[in-house]
């Protein structure tokens, strides 16, 4: 799930954004 997180901005809260 870290790959998509980088697109969001590399925060690491991909689960929180889950866009």
UniProtKB/Swiss-Prot annotation:
User: What keyword terms does UniProt attach to this protein?
Assistant: Ribonucleoprotein, Ribosomal protein, RNA-binding, rRNA-binding
Signal peptide start and end residues: none
- Which GO molecular function entries does the Swiss-Prot or TrEMBL record give? rRNA binding
The keyword ATP-binding is assigned to this record: no
Where does the source fall among the domains of life? Bacteria
A cellular-component GO term for this protein: ribosome
Say which family it is in.
Answer: Belongs to the universal ribosomal protein uS19 family.
Q: What does this protein do?
A: Protein S19 forms a complex with S13 that binds strongly to the 16S ribosomal RNA.
Q: Protein name, please? A: Small ribosomal subunit protein uS19
Instruction: Please name the source species.
Output: Spiroplasma citri
Q: What is the lineage of its organism?
A: Bacteria, Bacillati, Mycoplasmatota, Mollicutes, Entomoplasmatales
